[in-house]
């Protein structure tokens, strides 16, 4: 089954707007490994980023990876490195890369002893992150994994949603981020990054 199939009601609009004839393409993780070699420079070996501002792709849901690449390819999401890279990806490439990264494991990181995890945990409960991101915040379908993601990257994304400068397919994250203070963003990102 293609990872671009069954993306869900919230993502349907982007597919109708960006790729009206997205064919069903079987995903090939082995082919994805070959195609992912260029990704290693930023996202790290096997999609495990060592750069705190660059997301780890290991263990992300395949539909999420394919959807993000599609949004970069179609100009809905913009980034100086990702937009040119995605511009020439075929639907087969999107699926293969997505299958490869979804199959990788994100290793456990040492917890930051200076982090106030109680505030972050409270905010995650208060904002009901599990409703969309899954019970253990590992992501599902076209919604990303948050657990174990790079702290600085998470902060940047939350700030972008709050400022409405980050593309938000359905407006859920923009709404959720509005009441967050900078201290809340830091605490929430620290908590999520430290999850195993």
Give, region by region, the residue ranges found by the protein language model.
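Sequence/structural segment immediately N-terminal to covalent heme-attachment motifs in c-type
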Residues: 27-46, 112-135, 150
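Surface-exposed, polar helix/loop patches in the mature regions of secreted/periplasmic/lumenal proteins
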Residues: 90-145
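Gly/Gly-Pro-rich "capping" loops immediately C-terminal to redox-active cysteine motifs
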Residues: 47-78, 83-88, 121, 125, ...
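Bacterial N-terminal signal peptides that target proteins for export
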Residues: 1-12
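Sec/Tat signal peptide C-region and signal peptidase I cleavage site
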Residues: 22-26
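C-terminal capping alpha-helices of c-type cytochrome domains
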Residues: 87-109, 152, 157, 176-196
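Bacterial N-terminal signal peptides
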Residues: 10-21
């Amino acid at each position: 089954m293609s990872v671009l199939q069954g993306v869900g009601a919230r993502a349907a609009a982007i597919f109708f707007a960006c790729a009206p004839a997205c064919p069903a393409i079987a995903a090939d993780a082995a082919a994805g490994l070959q195609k992912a070699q260029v990704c290693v420079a930023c996202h790290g070996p096997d999609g495990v980023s060592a750069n705190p501002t660059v997301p780890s792709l290991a263990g992300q849901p395949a539909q999420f990876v394919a959807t993000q690449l599609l949004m970069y390819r179609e100009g809905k999401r913009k980034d100086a490195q990702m937009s040119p890279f995605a511009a020439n990806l075929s639907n087969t490439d999107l699926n293969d890369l997505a299958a490869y990264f979804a199959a990788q494991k994100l290793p456990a990181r040492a917890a930051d002893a200076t982090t106030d995890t109680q505030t972050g945990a409270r905010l995650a409960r208060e904002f009901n992150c599990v409703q969309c991101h899954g019970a253990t915040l590992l992501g599902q379908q076209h919604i990303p994994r948050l657990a174990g993601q790079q702290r600085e990257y998470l902060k940047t994304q939350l700030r972008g949603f709050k400022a409405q400068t980050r593309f938000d397919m359905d407006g859920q994250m923009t709404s959720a981020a509005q009441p967050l203070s900078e201290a809340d963003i830091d605490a929430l990102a620290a908590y999520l990054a430290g999850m195993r």
